[in-house]
Each structure stands twice: as C-alpha cells, then as structure tokens.
Amino acid sequence: MPTSLRQAATTMFEERSWLCIPLRKDTNGLAKVPISQGWTSLEPSLKTVESLPWEQAEGLGIVLGEKSNSLAVLDVDDEALAQAIMLYCWDRLDTSPRLVSTARNRLHIYFQEIDYPSPSSKQIVKFDGREVTVELKANGTQVA
C-alpha cells in the first residue's frame, strides 16, 4: 500500500500540481492525521512529495490552497444538500467539479479558486428543515 500511495501522490502533483502528504490513523481508526510535522510549510515540488515518509502512510491527504494550485473543498455533511449544490453549480460552471465520498459518508466537492486562496470557514445552515454543517476547507488545511 505505501508504494501505491507514493505513486498516487506523485501522479497528483505531476498532473494537477496538488501537494499530497502521508497520513496516519486518528483515534477513530480513520487515516486523517498528517505524519509529517510542519506539513503546512512544505514546498510544493515533486522532490518534496517523493521525500515524505510514505512507508509509514495509512492514507493520503491533499494540502489545500496556495500549495496545491488554489485547490479548495466544500465539505457538506448532508447528501441531499450536496446534490442540490451540485445541480445549482452544474448550470453555472464551465466544468464539472470533482466529487469524493468521505470515510464518514459525507461529500467533498473539489474546486479551484480563481482569484486567490480563501481562509477556511464553517457555517451551520438550515436545509429541508434540519441543520447541516457546510465547511469551506481551503488555504492551510488538508483533506483525506
């Protein structure tokens, strides 16, 4: 597994300029915690990606914001709301965003910020009579 994670990280950097880091499991057994100290200050380069401790990795994280070509993620904790957001966006975007189902059965919507990387933020919204958390994960954070 570690070799394939290293290769996936290398490919993502070469093809998309996304800086990926190795992750270890958290207390819930999910690979979400960066192995490397100082991952927020890593220089985005192929040499950096290849030098990380992938042999210890139990998962792969993507560093968001300026380190990864202004990549950001909308983390939606409700499937119905995520679908509504996607339908709204598909009518207004030039390309379809990438969707990823998370380890906790939530949805990540990946997109590239156009002007500059934003800080992360979190909102509780009402949707279909219930409260739902929607989080913009952006500059200085990572997603698994």
Predicted regions and their residues:
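Conserved phosphate/metal-binding and DNA-contacting active-site motifs used
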Residues: M1-A144
